[in-house]
Every structure is written in structure tokens, then in C-alpha cells.
Regions:
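Alpha-helical scaffold segments that form or flank carboxylate-/histidine-based iron centers
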Residues: 6-14, 38-53, 79-83, 109-122
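Conserved alpha-helical segments that form or flank metal/cofactor-binding pockets of metalloenzymes
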Residues: 38-71, 125-135
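Carboxylate-rich helix-loop segments that flank metal/cofactor sites and access channels
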Residues: 53-96, 140-160
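Preference for long, well-ordered alpha-helical segments
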Residues: 97-160
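Charged, compositionally biased N-terminal leader segments and the immediate start
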Residues: 1-3
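Alpha-helical bundle segments that constitute or directly flank the non-heme di-iron/ferroxidase center
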Residues: 5-34, 80-105
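Generic structural signal for well-ordered, non-transmembrane alpha-helical segments
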Residues: 18-22, 45-52, 56, 88-92, ...
Length: 160
């Protein structure tokens, strides 16, 4: 490949992966001290190590993104944005899961319930997105800032 930077579509996929895994890593690290079962603790250790490695590998591509810079800190005042991002990821995953479940549904009453729940998940996603967008926590139309936020979240998660 002779391009000077990553393709836009792969940059956006990197954004999705880094954002999702950064939130996941924080949650894993916050939960770990509360686990009492040794086998589960071992699984959490493996998951934490794997996600840390994933993030380290993925953020190496950020300098090749069409835009974006590094910043190793995440200020306490942006935790609202972090928590909103977690909710946004949950809502997005819910939309995907409901859509898949509907394609597997044969019973009309089950389909109707799932469609209503899908619509609720879509609404939650929209409300959460708009909350974040209005606060400038999700700069959807500014790729450089979007990637900057991803890096800040990843570095924060790795520093815990």
C-alpha cells in the first residue's frame, strides 16, 4: 500500500474498536478488585491483558489516520462524557442485538415485543448521542477531535 494515510472507513472502524475497548478496559479494571472467585479473577486478568495489548496495537495506527494526535491524559471533568460513551455503546450494541434477534423470530407476538424494544434502544441511542454531541463529548463531524478523544480514553484506560 502506497497511501500516505489510512483509509477513512478503516479509521472509523479503528475509532469504534478503540472507543469500545477503552470503556471495556476501564470497567474490567474497576470490577477486578471486587471479584472473589479465583478462576474468574484469572479470566479477568487474561481479559485485561488482552484488551491492553489490543489497545496498544490499535493506537499505533492513529498517527497514520487522516487526522488525530496523542494526549496521555483524561481530566476528571470529562468522566460524564466517558459514562455517556459507555451508555452510547450499550445502546448501539442493543440495537444490533435486537435487529439480529428479530431476524430469528418466528412468533408474531415475540417479534412485536422485540420491535418495540428495538425502537426503545434506537431512541436511547439517539438521546445519548445528542446529549454527548451537545456537550461536545462526541464530535461526530470532526474526525480529528473524535480520534483525539479515542486516544485520551485509551491512554486513561491503559494508565489505570
Amino acid at each position: 500500500m502506497n497511501e500516505a494515510h489510512l483509509a477513512w472507513h478503516e479509521t472509523l472502524e479503528l475509532h469504534e474498536l478503540v472507543a469500545f475497548q477503552s470503556v471495556g478496559l476501564v470497567k474490567l479494571k474497576q470490577t477486578y478488585p471486587h471479584i472473589t472467585n479465583n478462576d474468574l479473577k484469572t479470566l479477568y486478568n487474561e481479559a485485561i491483558a488482552t484488551v491492553e495489548e489490543n489497545l496498544q496495537e490499535l493506537i499505533e495506527f492513529f498517527p497514520n489516520a487522516p487526522r488525530g494526535e496523542k494526549s496521555p491524559s483524561l481530566a476528571a471533568e470529562v468522566m460524564t462524557g466517558f459514562y455517556a460513551g459507555d451508555l452510547l455503546g450499550f445502546a448501539k450494541t442493543s440495537v444490533r442485538n435486537y435487529a439480529i434477534a428479530i431476524t430469528e423470530t418466528a412468533t408474531p407476538m415475540v417479534r412485536e415485543v422485540l420491535q418495540n424494544q428495538l425502537n426503545n434502544a434506537i431512541e436511547l441511542h439517539a438521546k445519548t448521542f445528542h446529549f454527548m454531541y451537545e456537550r461536545s463529548d462526541y464530535p461526530a463531524y470532526n474526525l480529528e477531535r473524535l480520534l483525539q478523544t479515542d486516544l485520551e480514553n485509551a491512554y486513561y484506560a491503559l494508565s489505570m
